[in-house]
Amino acid sequence: HVYPIAAITKDSGGETLTEMADLKLGGAVGFSDDGRPVMNARVMRLAMEIARSLRMPILAHEEDIQLSAGGVMREGAVSTRLGLRGIPAQSESTMIARDVELAELTGVHLHICHVSSVRSLKTIELAKQWRCRVTCEVTPHHLMLTDEDIAGFDARYKVNPPLGFKTDREALRVALADGLIDVIATDHAPHHQDEKRCEFEQAMFGMIGLETALPLCLSLVRDGVISLRELIRRMTIEPAKILGLAVGALAVGAIADVTLFDPNESWTVGDAPHFSRSTNTPFWGKSLTGRVKATIVGGKVVYRDGEML
């Protein structure tokens, strides 16, 4: 199933609000300007007030574009060594702090997308202590990779928010285990190969993640970071709760949306059937363990053993 998230502002420009009530009637389950932040605090406050009245969440990409302008990776020792312009962690954390304050003011449910730094986690932890309606997510690649992986100037590692330090990665894993991070989301961002096979500075941000998310996260189970039960919960039940959807759970009378997987089967990304039209992942050609065997949607088997049915 695909559930639409509607734009907060027209053309995601950050200035003029969309017809949010009409978009809800049209089937939207939340509001977001996707990979663009709403820099205007007044506009964001109004959006939150309307979303609160509609009982809809705001899903925010948190980035101060005045701090991040021109940056291509996390600012730090590695960016300095590589001669690449950095994006400070504060580009994310300062916007999270602003939106947490606005969420407390308006009472909206604020969902913070793809958290990447320990600084951001501290603000989110404080917000939850204040009992603000705040949830957050982390991507598999931020749980697996760091800025040091960019040493070879491979643009497949170029994402936004950028890969953090080892300390950020470890903090994200702890926050996931402790429940501070509510869900795991892929931030799936396909690109044509020409948009990645170029100089790092000119390459587009983003990597694909739908087909590698499960095996990557299963490595966290094997490493003792999180239990299998909790991992499944963070990828199914909890995302559904955030969006107010009556899906994601196995129960009598529930919609039969089920994924069957073998946690021990190894496969090579790219050698096995690949369904995304893009290949922009640093895991291409890597051996991963854990493979989806079948997918059931609405009680109908739509995928089995490498074939779409």
Question: Each predicted region: which residue ranges?
Answer:
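C-terminal cap of metal-dependent C-N hydrolases
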Residues: E199-Q202, I255-E307
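Glycine/Thr-rich phosphate-binding loops of Rossmann-like dinucleotide-binding domains
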Residues: A41, L121, M144, H192-D194, ...
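His/Asp/Glu-enriched, well-ordered alpha-helical/loop segment
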Residues: R81-H109, R156, A177-I184, A189-N264
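Metal-cofactor-binding active-site regions of metalloenzymes
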Residues: H1-E15
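Histidine/acidic residue-rich metal-binding segments in metalloenzymes
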Residues: E15-I184
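Residue-level signal for pocket-adjacent positions within structured domains
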Residues: Y3, S79-L82, V138, D154, ...
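Fold-independent oxyanion-binding glycine-rich loops
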Residues: I5-I8, D33-G35, H61-E63, V115, ...
